[in-house]
Amino acid sequence: MKSRKELEIALSQVPKFRNPKAELEQHVTPADLAATILWTAHLAGEIEGKIIADFGCGTGIFCRGAELLGAEECICIDVDMDALDDGKAFLSRSDVTQADILTCPLRSIDVVFMNPPFGTVRRGIDKEFLTTALAKAKLSVYSIHLASEATERLFRSIALEYGFNTETVVTLYRMPIEYPWHRKRIHYMPVQVFKFKKSAQVISRT
């Protein structure tokens, strides 16, 4: 991949959810947003040669991008086998696993990418995803969340407890949320993208 735009074009081929499940708060990560996040990590040296995981991966857009950017290994985890089956054809080197990331045992991971449930159906699930990712990642976590000052304050505080500093990768993005049974086919929700980076002091002690 020579550019973020080239990566975006490649990621646009990753399938969407055929039958999105509202109870899982499944929302597609748009190719342009995924490319921005992945390219940011790539420029920081956090993909090539690294072990990457996508928590709640859906059809696997982050793992597909990580493959293209030279990750050593990609782990694609989701509870929804339908979504995993849809994405398998586009994943050449990823370990695709049906599991609940909140309870499944995980080995060493360098960087986690995720577009987790926002917590509108199951309150607090976004926080559970984040704490799980922070507990597993050796270097960084890139995560998409609803844009909210209160949420940002909470997540920055949680990150510090785990020894991570917080950076904003994308300040505001209007993410399309599409469910076939909605009267209005596409809704837009404001989201932010955070990078939680383990502090150098913590890394040096591990």
Q: Can you say where each PLM-predicted feature lies in the sequence?
A:
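S-adenosyl-L-methionine
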Residues: 1-53, 62
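Conserved S-adenosyl-L-methionine
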Residues: 56
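Conserved SAM-binding loop of SAM-dependent methyltransferases across substrates and taxa
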Residues: 59-71
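Conserved SAM-binding motif I beta-strand of class I
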Residues: 73-78
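Conserved short alpha-helix immediately C-terminal to the canonical SAM/SAH-binding motif I
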Residues: 82-83, 151
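Conserved SAM-binding loop
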Residues: 87-88
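Conserved SAM-binding strand-loop segment of SAM-dependent methyltransferases
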Residues: 92-101
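S-adenosylmethionine
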Residues: 101-192
